């Protein structure tokens, strides 16, 4: 099943969204060409105890979302995977997560109040077959004894 109950999700604060021209590193991540480097960028953060805990930079190629009008309220509630499942025709078939990934030139990290070398990042790629539907780079300040992934059975 694609859609999960999002009531337990940490609410996101939507900071920015709109079309941008992807830099070379982002084009490479998404498999975009120099002739069509445009993506829809969504920047959200999660606050814990009035401090920014993580910042999510999500990018959806315009070839995937060209006729879609993004629902800002839903972007605050749903994980991007669930949003794409609900609103897009192409449904994700799998994800891949890479840790300690390079950051792109459009990322503003001052919200995290930490030097870049202290930050931890990971990329979550959403695929439909071999097609990249979206990528989210999450940047966070590591904290001791904090669970990174919880798997439920």
PLM region spans:
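Conserved small/polar residues in nucleotide/adenosyl-binding loops
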Residues: 1-5
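C-terminal all-alpha effector/ligand-binding and dimerization domain
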Residues: 11-153
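Amphipathic alpha-helical segments that line or abut small-molecule/effector binding pockets
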Residues: 8
């Amino acid at each position: 099943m694609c859609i999960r109950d999002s009531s337990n999700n940490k609410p996101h604060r939507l900071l920015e969204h709109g079309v941008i021209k992807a830099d070379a590193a982002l084009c490479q991540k998404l498999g975009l060409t120099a002739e069509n480097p445009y993506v829809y960028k969504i920047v959200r953060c999660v606050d814990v105890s009035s401090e920014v805990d993580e910042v999510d930079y999500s990018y959806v190629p315009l070839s995937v979302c060209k006729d879609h009008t993004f629902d800002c309220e839903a972007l605050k509630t749903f994980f991007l995977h669930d949003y794409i499942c609900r609103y897009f025709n192409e449904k994700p078939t799998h994800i891949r997560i890479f840790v300690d990934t390079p950051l792109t030139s459009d990322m503003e990290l001052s919200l995290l109040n930490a030097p870049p070398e202290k930050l931890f990042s990971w990329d979550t790629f959403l695929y439909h077959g071999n097609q990249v539907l979206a990528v989210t780079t999450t940047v966070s300040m590591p904290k001791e004894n904090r669970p990174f992934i919880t798997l439920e059975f």
